[in-house]
Amino acid sequence: MEGRGLSELFRNTSEDMFLKAMMENSMGVAAAAPSMEMMGFRNLSQGFREDSEELFNSWLMNGEIPGFSAMNNRPRQPSRLSSEAAGFPNQQHEIAQEHFPTDNLIPQNLAVHSEFTMNHNQQQLKNAAEKGMQASDLLLAKAWFHSTQPMTRSRSSELRKRYAAMQSNMPPITTETIETANKLRQDLTNASTVNSAPMSNTPSQTPTFVSPSSSSTSPLDNPHIVAQDTITSVVSMLKDTLERKKLSSHANGDTSSGISFGFYDSQHFQQNILGGTDIFPLVTTSQIQDSVMLPKVERPTEQGSGNFVAPANQVWLGTASREPSQSGSSTAIPAPSAGFEVCDDLPPIGQAMTVCESTRTNAANGNGTADCRSKGKDFRERILKENLKDDRKKGSLTRMGSISSEQADKGDPTKKRRVERSRKMAEAKERSSTPVIPSDIQVVLKRCETLEKEVRSLKLNLSFMNRKDSEQTKQIEELQKQNEDLVEEKERLLEEIERIVSDTNT
């Protein structure tokens, strides 16, 4: 609690000093803003680390819960980072090195009317003064977050789940907000000075929590822009056109028509930064001046967003697409850099290639464009040669069967039938042919065959004899019976003779 009271004391002191410096300026713009060292915050940074955990927890709750926003709870929160580029022009170098996150950026400036009164300017200056302490506290909270909770695989998956849950609760960007942004950009462009950056360069963003990419960057760096249905349809149509043009350019083998990337024409290129595969079609400024639904939004595309120091090499794109970028964007004023490095991921070969690596001197002299163009031309010629070699290899590896079958296919049908018939006869002969048997085994086999025949004949004779025997047995039995009958008749005749003889004697 002692640290909190000390924080409030220095916040009030910084408000007085900042407002005094602002009122002395005739333009009403923060042209001579006091630095962090003048207000004494540099030496007291160690004392504020005690409250960094509490500050980070409050910021985390404001970012995670959709209904519990900073605008409803803290009156100082809406101008936390929204006017940072216009409020601190003299701290440009310091802010660019510390690389403030833009997750809690609230598009309050989009609803501001074009006519700025003196009271409104004073209120904005007061909010900017109050923001100085909040930005330093947020920086300490981020440092504590990186030191105590390193990014691991499990935590990355958890943060992606939270991001997916929050993405469905984000409010869409309406037409009135875009029209108000156009009016605000025109008014601030006329009123801005050389040192101050216009607010139109600050993209209108809604608060998010975690990066949509799978890389282990900080979840405090990546903004997300909610697209409207009309914008989504236009972007999808531009993507289809881009795919058709890319296929036609690969098929016809055209040369690049005057862009620094050397692969495609002047309307599109495929961007692959930090492993992202989103396609951002380039639309010129003249094409979107008359469009209300597609205002021009300038934002830096960074190569790395994992540390506090802003990278020196940045590519500024004037695009009409409102799709979420895979890389983090910084609201700090970028360091002037003419060098850029963009990697294109070509789908036909599935490998990434560095298209251009130019220094500030080469880009200023115009040598970078020629180098990129020559590299792109050589790379496409190499791709075409590899594709031609692959086609030749595929043609040489094509087989039509065996040589004999290929020759038979080329002949007349009569010859084809003759060859087929001879092949079938040869196969039948091989199946019917018996293996060669030695002579002694052949003699034994023949002897066995003759013996089998004799045994068969003997069996027939035996059966015949048995049949004969049965007949003879029957005849014998009949004869025996007849014999018995004859014996009985003989005895009877003998008795008859004896009786007759006896009668004659008497």
Swiss-Prot record:
<feature type="compositionally biased region" description="Basic and acidic residues">
    <location>
        <begin position="385"/>
        <end position="394"/>
    </location>
</feature>
<protein>
    <recommendedName>
        <fullName>Protein CYCLOPS</fullName>
    </recommendedName>
</protein>
<dbReference type="GO" id="GO:0005634">
    <property type="term" value="C:nucleus"/>
</dbReference>
<comment type="similarity">
    <text>Belongs to the CYCLOPS family.</text>
</comment>
<feature type="short sequence motif" description="Nuclear localization signal">
    <location>
        <begin position="415"/>
        <end position="418"/>
    </location>
</feature>
<feature type="coiled-coil region">
    <location>
        <begin position="441"/>
        <end position="506"/>
    </location>
</feature>
<dbReference type="GO" id="GO:0036377">
    <property type="term" value="P:arbuscular mycorrhizal association"/>
</dbReference>
<keyword id="KW-0539">Nucleus</keyword>
<keyword id="KW-0175">Coiled coil</keyword>
<feature type="compositionally biased region" description="Basic and acidic residues">
    <location>
        <begin position="422"/>
        <end position="432"/>
    </location>
</feature>
<feature type="region of interest" description="Disordered">
    <location>
        <begin position="385"/>
        <end position="434"/>
    </location>
</feature>
<dbReference type="InterPro" id="IPR040036">
    <property type="entry name" value="CYCLOPS"/>
</dbReference>
<dbReference type="GO" id="GO:0043565">
    <property type="term" value="F:sequence-specific DNA binding"/>
</dbReference>
<comment type="function">
    <text>Involved in arbuscular mycorrhizal (AM) symbiosis. Required for fungal infection in roots and arbuscule development during AM symbiosis.</text>
</comment>
<feature type="region of interest" description="Disordered">
    <location>
        <begin position="193"/>
        <end position="223"/>
    </location>
</feature>
<feature type="compositionally biased region" description="Low complexity">
    <location>
        <begin position="202"/>
        <end position="219"/>
    </location>
</feature>
